[in-house]
Amino acid sequence: MEDLIVKIFKESSQLKESFVNDNLSIIVRVVNVMTAVLKAGNKVMIFGNGGSAADAQHLAAEFVNRFMIERPPLPAISLSTDTSIITSIGNDYDFSEIFSKQIRALGQPGDIAWGISTSGRSRNVFKGLEQAKKMGLITLALTGKDGGDIAGIADYTLNVASDSTPRIQEVHITVGHVLCQMIDLKLFQRPDIK
């Protein structure tokens, strides 16, 4: 059992290392875009299913409350949390519309729509990003495996090239934390950092 535990930790750390080596330049671009969006007074809408819904809720809380420093709240919302909205759309229309309808209601040009899908194939996440693009929002996808259809629709895609859902999720939350920390740094401590 001990060997298996060590193996899991090593797989997680190795995947994070290969991910950052492959995606560092796009992470920097995403930090700069998100910083500009928030500085302009626009918002971030985050969404996903299952564990990705939990990540969306978690990361929205980091923006709205605080991450590591005391600072003013930043406008972010998880579209995965309102059970009345989600179930009414799912019941009256289709589950694939649960994010796209919310984006139609809440999104404004210049906002960010951030979809999370470990498979890259979640139909409702795809349709949410598709709707966001139609409305002039900036789209960000956090995906796994080969990125799926979602990778092809987003303005910015951070794909974790793995078939292991738990390891993908571990990288996803690390990416979210890195974005929060770098945005805090750029907005409130080191605006000169590139």
What is each residue range found by the language model?
Residues S52, Q57-I193:
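Glycine-rich phosphate-binding loops that contact phosphosugars or nucleotide phosphates
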Residues V44-M45, T139:
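Hydrophobic beta-strand scaffold residues
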Residues M1-D22:
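Generic N-terminal amphipathic, Lys/Arg-enriched alpha-helix
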Residues L15, G41-K43, P109-I112:
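Short, surface-exposed connector motifs at secondary-structure boundaries
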Residues D22-A40:
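A short, well-structured juxtamembrane/interface segment
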Residues M1, N23-I26, S52, K133:
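Residue-level recognition of alpha-helical structural elements
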